[in-house]
Amino acid sequence: MNLVNEAVIENLRENTKRLLDVYEDFGLNKTPKNISEDISGLLETAIERNVEGAIAPKVDSEPDIRYNGTAVEIKTSAGTNWRGGTFSKRPGYYIFVTYELDENN
């Protein structure tokens, strides 16, 4: 299962930069948790648009991605600690994403 290909990574990189620019342009201060949720949503969309057979339901009660019927969850963190909500312990596959923001973001 290869859901994170070069097209997905490039799409995520570009859209994350655009979103962070919007935050800055409008003077929005986001917490790491907010940014993690937004990056997760951008990754869901990037996978859905670039991987055949991938669907991003965008509903909390569903997995982040369904890939040919298989549940895939996305976890994002600005650090090394992984937290999750009500549905974070679903069986299935997981994609773990860590990120670091710097002055270029």
List each language-model region with its residue ranges.
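Interdomain/boundary linker segments immediately adjacent to catalytic/signaling cores
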Residues: 1-41
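Short, Φ-rich (hydrophobic/aromatic) sequence segments
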Residues: 5-11, 47, 97-105
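N-terminal, helix-rich and Lys/Arg-enriched segments in bacterial and organellar proteins
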Residues: 27-29, 60, 105
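Amphipathic alpha-helical segments that form well-ordered structural scaffolds
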Residues: 42-50
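Short, well-structured beta-strand/strand-turn elements
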Residues: 50-63
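Residues that flank catalytic or metal-binding motifs in active/ligand-binding sites
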Residues: 61, 68, 90
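Conserved catalytic cores of phosphodiester-cleaving nucleases, focusing on short active-site segments
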Residues: 65-76
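Catalytic cores of nucleic-acid endonucleases
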Residues: 76-105
